[in-house]
């Protein structure tokens, strides 16, 4: 195996990347190698989908399936080799289908194809053993002996960024938001990456193209969520258990949460959100269910202890999944969509009766704990409605600076920086937060500035779109560029969704972003220097020194 896509990958002076029997995330070498073959197969699908598009052939099923399959290879999503093999086999079938259609259309149009790349002609070996034997030829760092390490680094930046965008495309699709222009662009980029490009300038341009495409995807996802569940409104959420039978819903999929809420009505089961599902409480069409009683737990890296202590059924709707056997709760864990773990029950459709049965068989919480309320729901609409009051406080000098502190959480001790940063931020500053990084400080008390809460929970990682809209509105009001605002982004990364959001911000021209806790292992020192120079990206350091630098600017 060779995998270097997440923040926790092995980084030593001698080794970069996971290349042993098991990755740091827990996936086996077998699963990692199978995922490499799946990605290569999907690049072949995208080549033929791109050619088909040129002949006016648009296959909605393949367009919507391909990003979903790519999503399955994102960190902490699918650890099940059988499921990965099924997706790879499906990719081979779709590729053959598109190829036949393209060759027929090409013949009818008397316009033969130019040279077809190897990724498009690849034939999937007949069995798992042969597929695994072939896998080293399509490793994500293939060809490293013949090109500069910067080329490999930028290829991976593009591949991982596109993977993050594919995840958001799937989240949008679940809410019936699709766009053939976006699918066409996705296929073009995916196919091009399958040809192993070597031009650094073209690769850097491609990363910006991915960022801009993802902005459109986040806009589409925002529309899907708000059209389906209403615009989020500031809402108090209890983060302590309530007596009764219970189901815990983790991941990002609001659609699944709604189905679970509908199917548990009147059954005496309380439903809790976990991790990135916390923002669900702000959506009126979800919060209207009285048995959506609160949020349980914290960020993904703590789930093995927290899930073990949860006395009910658990549903993983998307990333991030850890080995459930460690906490011995695999028998009451259920996976959905692209999530998988060997031996764990998987729900193929919207029927959650098995989850309900499991929840009723568990003891549930035996007593109410004293309430602890936090506030969520500062989505795009709420932020825009609050903008006049915020602008007034800025003009009066009561708000001196805005910070967006958020992103992915993780295990490393250096991540305490983000807690320390929010606690050290002066009282005349506002802090926006999003994604699971917020759990390092979202239960703390920050007070308010003349009625405006100092901590504003914007939502999930994809709700960076909402924060961008607020920044654009402020820039318009103050007649300045976005980089001239008293606004600083302090972001933490872990996996590929965070990578594509960073690319989106870069593509929109946002500069001076602080990132951490460490640089991606797939980026060489030279590439990091290029990105720092081009986008004024900063690495987090000492909290007080960073604050002094920011506020003195």
From Swiss-Prot:
Sites where the protein binds hybrid [4Fe-2O-2S] cluster: 252, 276, 320, 408, 436, 461, 495, 497
Chain positions with Cysteine persulfide modification: 408
E.C. designation(s): 1.7.99.1
Localization: Cytoplasm
Principal subcellular localization: cytoplasm
Family matches, as InterPro entries: HCP/CODH (IPR004137), Hydroxylam_reduct (IPR010048), Prismane-like_a/b-sand (IPR016099), Prismane-like_sf (IPR011254), Prismane_a-bundle (IPR016100)
Co-factor binding details: Binds 1 [2Fe-2S] cluster. Binds 1 hybrid [4Fe-2O-2S] cluster.
Entry's transmembrane regions: none
Pfam families per the UniProt record, alphabetical: Prismane (PF03063)
Top-level taxon in the UniProt lineage: Bacteria
Cofactor names: [2Fe-2S] cluster; hybrid [4Fe-2O-2S] cluster
Binding-site list for [2Fe-2S] cluster: 3, 6, 18, 25
Enzyme class: oxidoreductase
GO MF annotations, alphabetized: 2 iron, 2 sulfur cluster binding; hydroxylamine reductase activity; metal ion binding; peroxidase activity
S-S bonds: none
Any one GO CC term of the record: cytoplasm
UniProt keyword terms in alphabetical order: 2Fe-2S, Cytoplasm, Iron, Iron-sulfur, Metal-binding, Oxidoreductase
GO biological process: response to hydrogen peroxide
Reaction(s) the record says it catalyses: A + NH4(+) + H2O = hydroxylamine + AH2 + H(+)
Function: Catalyzes the reduction of hydroxylamine to form NH(3) and H(2)O.
Family that this chain belongs to: Belongs to the HCP family.
HAMAP family: Hydroxylam_reduct (MF_00069)
Protein name: Hydroxylamine reductase
Source organism of the structure: Vibrio vulnificus (strain CMCP6)
Gene this chain is encoded by: hcp
């Amino acid at each position: 195996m060779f995998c270097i896509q997440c923040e926790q990958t092995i980084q030593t002076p001698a080794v970069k990347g996971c290349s042993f029997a098991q990755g740091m995330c827990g996936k086996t070498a077998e699963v990692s190698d199978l995922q490499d073959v799946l990605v290569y197969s999907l690049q072949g699908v995208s080549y033929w989908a791109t050619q088909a598009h040129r002949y006016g052939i648009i296959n909605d099923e393949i367009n919507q399936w391909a990003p979903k399959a790519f999503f399955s290879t994102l960190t902490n999503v699918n650890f099940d080799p059988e499921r990965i093999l099924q997706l790879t086999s499906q990719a081979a079938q779709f590729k053959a289908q598109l190829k036949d259609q393209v060759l027929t259309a090409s013949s009818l149009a008397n316009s033969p194809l130019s040279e077809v790349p190897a990724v498009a002609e690849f034939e999937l070996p007949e069995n798992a053993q042969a597929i695994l034997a072939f896998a080293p030829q399509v490793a994500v760092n293939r060809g490293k002996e013949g090109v500069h390490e910067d080329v490999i680094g930028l290829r991976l930046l593009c591949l991982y960024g596109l993977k993050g965008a594919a995840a958001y495309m799937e989240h949008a699709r679940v809410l019936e938001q699709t766009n053939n222009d976006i699918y066409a662009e996705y296929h073009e980029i995916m196919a091009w990456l399958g040809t192993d490009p070597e031009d650094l300038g073209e690769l850097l341009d491609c990363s910006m193209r991915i960022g801009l495409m993802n902005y459109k995807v986040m806009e589409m996802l925002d529309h899907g969520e708000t059209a389906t569940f209403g615009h989020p409104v500031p809402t108090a959420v209890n983060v302590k258990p309530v007596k009764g039978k219970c189901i815990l819903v983790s991941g990002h999929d609001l659609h699944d949460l709604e189905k679970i809420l509908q199917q548990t009505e009147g059954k005496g089961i309380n439903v809790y959100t976990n991790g990135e599902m916390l923002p669900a409480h702000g959506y009126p069409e979800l919060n209207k269910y009285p048995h959506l009683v609160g949020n349980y737990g914290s960020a993904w890296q703590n789930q093995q202890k927290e899930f073990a202590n949860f006395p009910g059924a658990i549903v993983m709707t998307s990333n991030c999944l850890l080995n459930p056997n460690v906490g011995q709760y695999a028998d009451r864990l259920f996976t959905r969509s692209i999530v998988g773990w060997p031996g764990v029950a998987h729900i193929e459709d919207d029927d959650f009766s098995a989850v309900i049965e499991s929840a009723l068989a568990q003891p549930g919480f035996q007593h109410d704990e004293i309430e602890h309320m936090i506030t969520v729901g500062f989505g795009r609409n709420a932020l825009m409605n609050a903008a006049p009051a915020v602008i007034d406080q800025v003009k009066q000098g009561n708000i001196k600076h805005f910070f967006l502190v958020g992103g992915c959480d993780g295990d490393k001790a250096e991540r305490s920086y983000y807690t320390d940063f929010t606690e050290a931020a002066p009282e005349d500053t506002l802090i926006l937060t999003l994604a699971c990084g917020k759990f390092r400080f979202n239960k703390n008390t920050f007070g308010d500035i003349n009625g405006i809460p100092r901590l504003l929970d914007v939502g999930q990682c994809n709700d960076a779109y909402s924060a961008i809209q607020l920044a654009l509105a402020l820039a318009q009001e103050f007649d300045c560029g976005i980089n001239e605002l008293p606004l600083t982004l302090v972001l933490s990364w872990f996996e590929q969704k965070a990578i594509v959001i960073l690319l989106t911000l870069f593509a929109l021209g946002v500069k001076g972003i602080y990132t951490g806790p460490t640089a991606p292992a797939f980026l060489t020192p030279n590439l990091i220097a290029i990105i720092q120079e081009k986008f004024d990206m900063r690495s987090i350091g000492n909290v007080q020194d960073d604050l002094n630098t920011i506020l003195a600017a």
